[in-house]
UniProtKB/Swiss-Prot annotation:
Enzyme superclass (EC): transferase
UniProt-listed NCBIfam families: PRK00029.1 (NF000658)
Protein name as it appears in the record: Protein nucleotidyltransferase YdiU
Organism whose genome encodes this protein: Flavobacterium johnsoniae (strain ATCC 17061 / DSM 2064 / JCM 8514 / BCRC 14874 / CCUG 350202 / NBRC 14942 / NCIMB 11054 / UW101) (Cytophaga johnsonae)
Entries under PANTHER family matching the protein: PROTEIN ADENYLYLTRANSFERASE SELO, MITOCHONDRIAL (PTHR32057:SF14)
UniProt-listed HAMAP family: YdiU_SelO (MF_00692)
InterPro entries per the UniProt record, alphabetical: SelO
Needed cofactors: Mg(2+); Mn(2+)
Amino acid sequence: MKNLKINNRFTAELPADPDLTNETRQVKNTAFSYVNPTKPSNPKLIHASEETAALVGISKEEIHSEEFLNVFSGKEILPETQPYAMCYAGHQFGNWAGQLGDGRAINLTEVENNNTFYTLQLKGAGKTPYSRTADGLAVLRSSIREYLCAEAMYHLGVPTTRSLSLILSGDQVLRDILYNGNPAYEKGAVVCRVAPSFIRFGSFEMLAARNELKNLKQFVEYTIKHYFPEITGEPKEQYLQFFKKVADTTREMILHWQRVGFVHGVMNTDNMSVHGITIDYGPYGWLENYDPNWTPNTTDSQNKRYRFGNQPQVAHWNLYQLANAIYPLINETEGLEKILESFMDDFILDYKEMFLNKLGLFTSTETDNDLIDNLEAVLQLTETDMTIFFRNLSSVKKTDSVEKAIEKIQFAFYKIEEVSGEILDAWKKWFSVYLDRLNAEVLSDEVRLQKMNLINPKYVLRNYMAQLAIDAADKEDYSLVNELYTLLQKPYDEQPEYQKWFAKRPDWATSKVGCSMLSCSS
């Protein structure tokens, strides 16, 4: 990979852990620890993203080289690089968890391509000083989910990390998939993921909690210098501008999640990026039947903190924790509080506009809030598939009758027999108002359909789809991984050759582990 432009500015400019032993411990006064990946016994490339490779300066030919396989499986280390694991803390499910860090992520290096910097990180490449009681490895199951999801999210237009490669390690990894005392061996795998950086809210929380204010200042200023060079002014003003940027990009990310029906599942502060990109794809899922109270994470099944409808509020809460972390550099609350107060106000306005656009409405009226609220209510009267409903809504014409409009979206109903009586009346009432509202718009049906189909995806990575790919891959059949990767590169296109994936969750998936129930086990 001769054209890779290596850059080690993170390790050159931030304090390193002087202890080079790879033993689990509390690591203080540092941003990272040097650590080498665990060498896999028999790596095998399952898939690589040519798009992501091109981003970082790797050619199509190099993807299939032995060097690519060895470097991105952790078997070899790139010349002139020193891999490292980052130190950070976080709030998990609302509670302070203390030191966390890269427990099974190892950063290989940064590279520069076309005046943009990217960090290359292996997930599942072995133990680090932050692994606690874990082995630092990952299984094929979770690696396929992460690999496919990051690329699917990118093509949906959602800010995200990217996936470069998915490699089988050749080793067996012991996991208890539901944490119920039934561990079993699974195939090991390594994913290489790519981002501007993997700096998290928790990176600053760790330093603030330990009162390492010199290091905190150094880390914040490093982040501003390299990733927010447009920020200028006095130091305190720079810190506020930085916080505002993070708040704005976080708000935009959450808006996209709500637009496509994505539920992250583990919105801990250590899983929040300062770049406003989606990171750490664990027990995620897409809404199938529209249910704001749904979370895919079994760990959160009781309190549902990270449920779909609560993601904006959690993002807001997480930003409060980031504000608390950088407060010692500012020593004034007013500026931070102002940014935090405007977050939800701005989100509510943006959410309304986004939702109206999903409905094909590009002007605003006084009754729009009622239209949105009433739809969110009627969608829950009987199980209604979110993705299919909004996609098929684009085919409704201004001249359609209420009955015709309902007929066009009825494929979204999981139990069509329930759509009668009061439920049918509620749908008729909503569509009557919606059709009137459509007729107040100036866009033609054809133009509106095109615009709606660029907002409402036809294809998303439903959990049952990922599980089918996992089941096949477990038998060394990677054709579904390839097919889903190709399908999800164009989620807004009709792709009639893949029409079978434009389907509601099958009955068998309602109670299958990996489809309806997911844990953090990976």
